[in-house]
């Protein structure tokens, strides 16, 4: 069995292997899409293929949509050459369920794959043709937050961005210049409206995308490459909108175990490849089942019926509330607690931590118990149901290869949102945050983690963090097994509003965190003992 249009003719074999096939005519959908594209997507990687491709597949299957998605890769052209075109743009979607079983389905909704290479005439001319089509309704993105960045920390444009600014719109290279140039093409072809939708997992994603596109356009205007009228066109949200969105679906790299099971079913040529840009990608995509996509409903040229495939269409304020619910209460704070304690207690898989009585109890306390009284309720999703699914379905999923070490990366940049917002809400509601028990325990766990010594007293490597040098320097005289070596070294960290968004002493929990920390450095097994003492009724 081969994952190609020819290979799908062997319908019985696929059926016997328990793999669902599209109910629609894939070639006809591709033909219609090429003639009259309505949806272009930039960033042809895994989350796009299984989640966004799955949405389109659902809509085509139900007759809500006649056309698929035009997929554009802006960074790693090997993806098109090695994963799209040899497999006729098909994708084998594998859903990894919490009970260890899988659901498998072929998606035929990715109608065309194009490389955003302005120096290759057939690729670039095709993109210009698509953007000139007045019926194009939306372009969407999963290029990661880095794809929108134009400047480095020094405030100067990255050299490759500066090159795009200096060059004319005819030969762009970076994603933002490519999109800006194609919007200029659309403007010149008659100024048809368009929705430009970021689906990347970062807050205020639509604003970030809009700022980058506008910056590029204004730089080109200064050089006389584009007109002020073009800048006005993309500045007018009734012409070119930049809806905000919230996306949530864990899509790990292709798993070896999944690849083996597909090969055992008789599927050929399904193994992952490593591209020249170091992308690890396969003809199949594996991901968890739960998925959320919430989009601000602002589409000036119409849109597919996305809500009929489970997408929540709403206003900008609600998108923001869902994002806030997820990152400040229902998912991210739980992840960070498991990350820091997982490293200190010797875990290498987040899912395994949920079998640990104390750590399981800790996330129950942080989310449902302490988070819920002050949670941002978006109205369209139940925070209680969301956090329940996170704790009972998503984090314990044995297929999820997430490690505490990866999630512990950049924790100093995350604790302000993940814990600081709840602490501030308690101060606003109750005058202080002294009611909190589990969140101070999570913060104490992070401080204990920063010693780089596990609960047995053995050293481990700390994950990267922009504040690591500063934080470890503050704690350099604290010695594992010597409680008396603690002489207030945490004060500079816990009172730092740049880290937590609030001085934790003013919130009434700084001293409590210090006490917990001192208990946790007492010697081997002290972290486990402290968790037990503080997480029993």
At which residue positions do the language-model features occur?
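Substrate/ligand-engaging "lid" and interaction regions
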Residues: 1-42, 46-537
